[in-house]
Amino acid sequence: MMKKIAVLGAGSWGSILANLLDENGHSVRLWSYSPAQVTELNEKHTNERYVPDFKYSETLTAYSNLTQAIDGADVILFVVPTKAIREVAQQVTAVLAKTHQRPIIVHASKGLEQETHKRLSQVLAEEIPTELRQAIVVLSGPSHAEEVARHDITLITAASADESAAELVQQLFMNDYFRIYTNTDVVGVELGAALKNIIALGAGALHGLGYGDDAKAALMTRGLAEISRLGVALGAEPLTFIGLSGVGDLIVTATSVHSRNWRAGNELGAGQDLKTVIDTMGMVIEGIPSTKAAYELAQQQNIEMPITEAIYDVLYKSADIKEVIPQLMRREGKPEIQ
């Protein structure tokens, strides 16, 4: 079942997913806005800024021209930063209006649109042609590009209101080291993906401050409770948060040095200021804008999210990171399950 697939976004995750699909026997075109990156991928088969010391398939072709990249595609996979997804979707829609294609639209980005607090499938649904909206598929779960690149075992979720679309995407990606489960709870899968980055910032900060495993386990457990509370209030299924796109993604993101959100939190905990952390990372730290969006959603929904609020205070109100933890610990005693 060879398909023509356009992958939009040549960062670490987008480029490695494109390489996986190419290795699975599909015809893959990888789009990047950077002509220099396209040249590197096509001539050297490398992407040193994002995935150092890795050789991409020689049959994988990169493009800087969006029209060429998506021409004839059966599937279009968005793997661009959250802040860019609406603009890129508008550009894709302009091309589709001329070509009259009806591809399946998939996204593997993790975040919430900061200005609107919308999930990314909602953003896509507002921009893509009407007839493509019902079959949007979300790819999410515990995954690091570096590990997929070396064929480590990885399991993630494909979620869609259209079960047949999710099953098609499942078959595109599955192989000996990459397994996908389907789910119909798009809301829960997307919120798990976005909100776990906030908790990963906190876990990294605890490490940078010198706290041990007890504190990190407590943070992840209570953080998952916050994610679930907000998610259910916004229409998610509770069980989704104990699945791959919930607790699975939280564990891998909040415990691994591969996680840019964990690394950013670690630097903040070690005493670096936020601007320096952002400047030195060189890649998007989705947990930062997601913290603001989640905090404001919690206020609107009247949902208690003390960990998220503490991280928001550090990021957006210049609160002292060493002081917010004792403040959390001194909160009024409560039942664990409410």
Swiss-Prot record:
<feature type="binding site">
    <location>
        <position position="12"/>
    </location>
    <ligand>
        <name>NADPH</name>
    </ligand>
</feature>
<keyword id="KW-0443">Lipid metabolism</keyword>
<keyword id="KW-1208">Phospholipid metabolism</keyword>
<feature type="binding site">
    <location>
        <position position="260"/>
    </location>
    <ligand>
        <name>sn-glycerol 3-phosphate</name>
    </ligand>
</feature>
<keyword id="KW-0520">NAD</keyword>
<dbReference type="GO" id="GO:0051287">
    <property type="term" value="F:NAD binding"/>
</dbReference>
<keyword id="KW-0594">Phospholipid biosynthesis</keyword>
<dbReference type="GO" id="GO:0008654">
    <property type="term" value="P:phospholipid biosynthetic process"/>
</dbReference>
<feature type="binding site">
    <location>
        <position position="141"/>
    </location>
    <ligand>
        <name>sn-glycerol 3-phosphate</name>
    </ligand>
</feature>
<dbReference type="InterPro" id="IPR013328">
    <property type="entry name" value="6PGD_dom2"/>
</dbReference>
<feature type="binding site">
    <location>
        <position position="284"/>
    </location>
    <ligand>
        <name>NADPH</name>
    </ligand>
</feature>
<feature type="binding site">
    <location>
        <position position="13"/>
    </location>
    <ligand>
        <name>NADPH</name>
    </ligand>
</feature>
<feature type="binding site">
    <location>
        <position position="259"/>
    </location>
    <ligand>
        <name>sn-glycerol 3-phosphate</name>
    </ligand>
</feature>
<comment type="similarity">
    <text>Belongs to the NAD-dependent glycerol-3-phosphate dehydrogenase family.</text>
</comment>
<dbReference type="Pfam" id="PF07479">
    <property type="entry name" value="NAD_Gly3P_dh_C"/>
</dbReference>
<dbReference type="InterPro" id="IPR006109">
    <property type="entry name" value="G3P_DH_NAD-dep_C"/>
</dbReference>
<feature type="binding site">
    <location>
        <position position="249"/>
    </location>
    <ligand>
        <name>sn-glycerol 3-phosphate</name>
    </ligand>
</feature>
<dbReference type="GO" id="GO:0046167">
    <property type="term" value="P:glycerol-3-phosphate biosynthetic process"/>
</dbReference>
<feature type="binding site">
    <location>
        <position position="261"/>
    </location>
    <ligand>
        <name>sn-glycerol 3-phosphate</name>
    </ligand>
</feature>
<keyword id="KW-0444">Lipid biosynthesis</keyword>
<dbReference type="GO" id="GO:0005975">
    <property type="term" value="P:carbohydrate metabolic process"/>
</dbReference>
<dbReference type="GO" id="GO:0046168">
    <property type="term" value="P:glycerol-3-phosphate catabolic process"/>
</dbReference>
<feature type="binding site">
    <location>
        <position position="196"/>
    </location>
    <ligand>
        <name>sn-glycerol 3-phosphate</name>
    </ligand>
</feature>
<dbReference type="InterPro" id="IPR036291">
    <property type="entry name" value="NAD(P)-bd_dom_sf"/>
</dbReference>
<protein>
    <recommendedName>
        <fullName>Glycerol-3-phosphate dehydrogenase [NAD(P)+]</fullName>
        <ecNumber>1.1.1.94</ecNumber>
    </recommendedName>
</protein>
<feature type="binding site">
    <location>
        <position position="143"/>
    </location>
    <ligand>
        <name>sn-glycerol 3-phosphate</name>
    </ligand>
</feature>
<dbReference type="InterPro" id="IPR011128">
    <property type="entry name" value="G3P_DH_NAD-dep_N"/>
</dbReference>
<feature type="binding site">
    <location>
        <position position="110"/>
    </location>
    <ligand>
        <name>NADPH</name>
    </ligand>
</feature>
<dbReference type="GO" id="GO:0006650">
    <property type="term" value="P:glycerophospholipid metabolic process"/>
</dbReference>
<feature type="binding site">
    <location>
        <position position="260"/>
    </location>
    <ligand>
        <name>NADPH</name>
    </ligand>
</feature>
<comment type="pathway">
    <text>Membrane lipid metabolism; glycerophospholipid metabolism.</text>
</comment>
<comment type="function">
    <text>Catalyzes the reduction of the glycolytic intermediate dihydroxyacetone phosphate (DHAP) to sn-glycerol 3-phosphate (G3P), the key precursor for phospholipid synthesis.</text>
</comment>
<keyword id="KW-0547">Nucleotide-binding</keyword>
<dbReference type="InterPro" id="IPR008927">
    <property type="entry name" value="6-PGluconate_DH-like_C_sf"/>
</dbReference>
<dbReference type="Pfam" id="PF01210">
    <property type="entry name" value="NAD_Gly3P_dh_N"/>
</dbReference>
<feature type="binding site">
    <location>
        <position position="110"/>
    </location>
    <ligand>
        <name>sn-glycerol 3-phosphate</name>
    </ligand>
</feature>
<feature type="active site" description="Proton acceptor">
    <location>
        <position position="196"/>
    </location>
</feature>
<keyword id="KW-0963">Cytoplasm</keyword>
<keyword id="KW-0521">NADP</keyword>
<feature type="binding site">
    <location>
        <position position="286"/>
    </location>
    <ligand>
        <name>NADPH</name>
    </ligand>
</feature>
<dbReference type="GO" id="GO:0005829">
    <property type="term" value="C:cytosol"/>
</dbReference>
<dbReference type="GO" id="GO:0047952">
    <property type="term" value="F:glycerol-3-phosphate dehydrogenase [NAD(P)+] activity"/>
</dbReference>
